[in-house]
Amino acid sequence: MAGLTLFVGRLPPSARSEQLEELFSQVGPVKQCFVVTEKGSKACRGFGYVTFSMLEDVQRALKEITTFEGCKINVTVAKKKLRNKTKEKGKNENSECPKKEPKAKKAKVADKKARLIIRNLSFKCSEDDLKTVFAQFGAVLEVNIPRKPDGKMRGFGFVQFKNLLEAGKALKGMNMKEIKGRTVAVDWAVAKDKYKDTQSVSAIGEEKSHESKHQESVKKKGREEEDMEEEENDDDDDDDDEEDGVFDDEDEEEENIESKVTKPVQIQKRAVKRPAPAKSSDHSEEDSDLEESDSIDDGEELAQSDTSTEEQEDKAVQVSNKKKRKLPSDVNEGKTVFIRNLSFDSEEEELGELLQQFGELKYVRIVLHPDTEHSKGCAFAQFMTQEAAQKCLLAASPENEAGGLKLDGRQLKVDLAVTRDEAAKLQTTKVKKPTGTRNLYLAREGLIRAGTKAAEGVSAADMAKRERFELLKHQKLKDQNIFVSRTRLCLHNLPKAVDDKQLRKLLLSATSGEKGVRIKECRVMRDLKGVHGNMKGQSLGYAFAEFQEHEHALKALRLINNNPEIFGPLKRPIVEFSLEDRRKLKMKELRIQRSLQKMRSKPATGEPQKGQPEPAKDQQQKAAQHHTEEQSKVPPEQKRKAGSTSWTGFQTKAEVEQVELPDGKKRRKVLALPSHRGPKIRLRDKGKVKPVHPKKPKPQINQWKQEKQQLSSEQVSRKKAKGNKTETRFNQLVEQYKQKLLGPSKGAPLAKRSKWFDS
């Protein structure tokens, strides 16, 4: 605050805070401005203070502002006034000692956040042993084992971690575990006075607690007396401060009450008492109750303390009135927002930096738990204007295109702060959650209408294409199963020469400013009819691209769509979010699951399951073997008659033409693409199947083999004919009927007449 605060000296007695603020607001936004006045009157004492929000405005004000209503004024950077509680001992003490005290206090407050207490500690355990045990959970900043005046250990210790996450892991991992042969109890460390308050609940310790409260009240009262004496002495010191330009926080607070300017301390207290909407009302009620209980306890302590003089009683009453005074509520102004789902490690400075993009902030306050002093995961923030608060609410809504506000990897939930009565009503009413999952708001993304500014310079052919695509989109979206994808883009009007690599490069360049851009799919659609070998088909002029994140897809769409600099002004890309069919996506998931099951079953069994299609090569080999076996089994007479018969066509087995889906519906069976090249070898008709790998044998050897096979087959057939004459007779009759009905084939050789010696 001191670096942003200016000390303004040599002001006339008629100077007012409003006039001073009007003068300095010409340089930049003024956060705070007041003129120090005489007690009991509005006359200016000749100096004042101005606080800016930005350091640049402070530098400008030092250079530009030199006069006030025609009078020359002194403008310097205000110095922080450091008070020493023992002023009576000497005002000439070195100022370095009091500077160290507030820093030490701040460090203690920060340390409490990630600090653990280890009870029931063994006397054999040293600080180094304790550090080595807890170092496995994270960075240990400090280890402390308190000792008695005689040097013996007290049986407990403290471990300070770097952040809350590591401390939480250590608490879960080491609670009720043994260290040096002794089971320890690990818990969050709290302030000593709060621990004593919790321990003084029993009836036995009530008297002791009253005595301690009495002592604390006497101490507080003594501090208040010193503060009141210091305030009285401030009148003498302010003249020196005017020359030195010293800035005092306490003077500022007292004088702000008189000048009706909001104090920073009041703002922070007001943040704690802020009631929250439905889900956040519990936090706000607890905080407000704590504030009220604190003020009541202070009043009781002042009432119990025995005052020696009437002046001390008057001062105590004044202090209690100040504490009990209700602060004005700023909920109805619509400038305060309540933030939920905060990370426990998030700080007020980080949250303030995130919210400053929407407008100037009055305060940011993270709600702390009263016992542990850890963050509750929620906060309050008040903007200077109502418009800034509305901008913040719009940016944080989940329906926003940017995806809402994120801090430390968590999605922030922002709502307007409401009164306690409204919060109670919101708890009873159930909020209807949006059920739309079709993302129809993205259907208009990339739309360019004729006659608009975006349509200037677009060729008539491109506009006709856009109108046609828009009409098709409207027709498809009438089906409830069609939805708009959030990550998949459809790109039309692409040149024929653009391939997958060029398109991927274009999309990555469009999202070059983003971090972690990943394209899952990028495919230019091509005509595959009449294409063989490694030849690529001609591009169809459109493509699909799928991103990992919605924000990246949205940025690529807005940069590439209708951009004349990519492919020229006459051929501008038409980019829109792709339409998806839920039914087809379900079918795709089922196919993937089946393939995964097949892959898992193969290494387990080593053989394909029943009903699974075999590879094409195995099918061909098995078919050839089966064919040769059948030929060897057929008797020679049937072979001769079969040779004379004509081709009877394919003899196929009845196959299922429809496939039943899991939802009960049926669809036509889709045959898979062939896994081999060349002419189709059909397994349904065995009439003209060639051997798999035919070899050209020598003619003499081939004839000798044929004769040998005929002799062997005749011998086998004679043996079988004796055993089963009825079957051979039936086959002969069938062959005779075939010859009569179909006639002998042209290419078939004439049947040999039986010789006289065969009978």
UniProtKB/Swiss-Prot annotation:
Polar residues bias spans: 700-715
GO CC terms: nucleolus; spliceosomal complex
Biased composition (Basic and acidic residues): 85-101, 205-224, 615-640
InterPro entries for this protein: Nucleotide-bd_a/b_plait_sf, RBD_domain_sf, RRM_dom, RRM_MRD1_RNA_proc_ribogen
Stretches assigned to the RRM domain: 4-80, 114-191, 335-419, 487-597
Region (Disordered): 84-105, 201-330, 594-759
Biased composition (Acidic residues): 225-256, 284-313
Compartments in which it is found: Nucleus, Nucleolus
Record PTM Phosphoserine, positions in chain: 122, 397
Organism domain of life: Eukaryota
Pfam families associated with the record: RRM_1 (PF00076)
UniProt note on tissues of expression: Ubiquitously expressed.
GO BP of this protein: mRNA processing; RNA splicing
Annotated keywords: Acetylation, Disease variant, Hypotrichosis, Intellectual disability, Isopeptide bond, mRNA processing, mRNA splicing, Nucleus, Phosphoprotein, Repeat, RNA-binding, Spliceosome, Ubl conjugation
Biased composition (Basic residues): 689-698
Keyword Transcription: no
N-acetylalanine carried by residues: 2
Cross-link (Glycyl lysine isopeptide (Lys-Gly) (interchain with G-Cter in SUMO2)): 653
GO MF terms, alphabetically ordered: RNA binding
Main location: nucleus
Associated disease: Alopecia, neurologic defects, and endocrinopathy syndrome: Affected individuals have hair loss of variable severity, ranging from complete alopecia to near-normal scalp hair with absence of body hair. All have moderate to severe intellectual disability, progressive motor deterioration and central hypogonadotropic hypogonadism with delayed or absent puberty and central adrenal insufficiency. Additional features included short stature, microcephaly, gynecomastia, pigmentary anomalies, hypodontia, kyphoscoliosis, ulnar deviation of the hands, and loss of subcutaneous fat.
Quaternary structure note: Interacts with U1, U2, U4, U5, and U6 spliceosomal small nuclear RNAs (snRNAs).
Function: Nucleolar component of the spliceosomal ribonucleoprotein complexes.
Protein name listed in UniProt: RNA-binding protein 28
